[in-house]
Amino acid sequence: CREGRYGQCMGGGGWILGNEIDGTQAEYVRVPFADTSTYPVPVGTSDEELLMLADILPTGYEVGVLNGHVQPGDTVAVVGSGPVGLSAIMGARLFSPAHIVAIDQADARLDAAKLFGADTVVNNAHDDPVEVVQALTDGLGADVAIEAVGVPATFELAVELVRPAGRIANIGVHGAPVTLNLERLWTRDVTITTGLVDTYSTPTWLRLLPEHHVDVARFVTHRFSLDDFIEAYDVFSRAAETSALKVVLTRSA
């Protein structure tokens, strides 16, 4: 905690809400260690904008963009265009990369990726993203490959996308072992990072929102009242069919 690595706090800290204790879909919520996780709301921000800070934007930004050390002029490949992948695209755009390539198998999410700042989109169900990235980089590969899905195939794709001396930033939450081809990675000086979000970037995003430097409201694709709770969850669970990104529930009047 003293190092600002709040996701790894010892003695009862770290990832608590929705993990070790119940989440926040309740009338009242007790927030442990609130000094490191609550912030005053700036004037000029909406509730929907603030929802995106808990925690897709810090996740894509910290675990993807900052861990990947995105630099001006980089070519960045983002594997997965769900809300966290889109957050990584939005965050990467702040660093003026030369090119951002978004990769997904859902055309609706690739359309969203264009709105969030991707220069090129690739549906890897039909096209080879490795060929696309190599064509953009004279055969070198991406400076940074960000994995935002969490399955073995997408991590292995990130390995294929990255250039020698490049960086792979893994955001995806993996539930199964992944093959790590070290015999190929170590000779190419590839750096791999992983991690939980620490949300230390939340103050940065809170400064950006009132000035409209980023448009985070576009994450919200569906809105429901709490009376339609079950329908809202059904829509979100079928995101590939419904084109849902983020679903907002509001209390009935």
Residues covered by each model-derived region:
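Glycine-rich phosphate/adenylate-binding loop and adjacent beta-alpha elements
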Residues: C1-T38
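A general structural signal for well-ordered alpha-helical segments in protein cores
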Residues: Y6, Q25-A26, T38, L57-G60, ...
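Mid-domain Rossmann-like dinucleotide-binding core that forms the NAD(H)/NADP(H) cofactor-binding site
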Residues: V43-D127, E131
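Glycine-rich cofactor phosphate-binding loops and adjacent beta1-alpha1 units
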Residues: N67-P72, F95, D111-T191, I230, ...
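Structural detector of well-ordered beta-strand residues that form the stable sheet scaffold
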Residues: A77, V101, R167-A169, T193, ...
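Conserved acidic E/D residue at the C-terminus of a beta-strand in Rossmann-like folds
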Residues: D104, G172, L196
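C-terminal hydrophobic helical "lid"/dimerization subdomain
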Residues: E156-E160, T199-A253
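Rossmann-fold dehydrogenase core element
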Residues: R167-A169, T179-F219
